[in-house]
Amino acid sequence: MALIVIVVLFSSCVSNRKISMMKKIIDEKKLIEKNLETKITTLNDFRINKSAIGELDDKSNESILKVLDTEKKGILQRTDSLNKMEAMLSGDKRIKIKEFKNIESIVATSNDIIAVKSESINFVDQLLKQQTFVKFNTAAFFNAGGFKIPEDKMDEAKIVFSPIVDSLIVFIKKFPKYKLNSSIIASGFADATGFSPGSLVDLLTSNMGKTEATKEELNSELSRLRAEEVSSILLTIYNERIKELANTGQFNTQFFKIGKGEEFPNKKIDNYQTDDERRRIVVIYWNALPE
């Protein structure tokens, strides 16, 4: 009778060989997760640097950070699950077949999860490696104190702005199976030069719904209006390009215009001056991330 009990007991448990093989598979999964985590850390450092030197706008920066944080959280959760299963397999208690099959199922499912997550991380990698911006001095297209591009400079402006739209479209077309949310952002910057009383000050102040405004507020509004003008041209170019495409359903692009005012365009430059053409710029960015 005792012999029968022992036979039944052992037949309901998993062999040491199977446990050893599963522990090896789990170690391999943990290494893959560790490599993904290392890649996320590298991408995050790259993101921080691009943002600091003005090659990544605030909206894109926040969106990419959110994706990376989400993926890192997932890695930590999956690694924790793998560690718990490994501890169970390494314990003194014998593993029953039902418990082992549950571990097998979880580990098998992780293959598909890791594949999807790897694609997401690789997508961000490719996005960060793209040159997703173009900048130009405001004097190239705007008259002093002006925020409308003159008609005689409009064709030239479209030639300069078109590549940023084209590069976004090319990037999106590389990922036909993704439904992407994309953005084109025009950010205007100004130096700290003051304003003489006159019609420009009156117009900018009125635009802000005020009777008086500080120099900083005036520069912020002027930079916003210039960004708005650039954004309207970008939208025209974008709509023209989209008409030529067969699958327009893949494209969901928003346009943003932001006045940065006297904020420094490049946070790593420490010798900006009050009157400085390096600060009088408009920067156009694009981004595209999976929904």
At which residue positions do the language-model features occur?
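N-terminal targeting segments with Sec-dependent signals, encompassing both cleavable signal peptides
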Residues: M1-E291
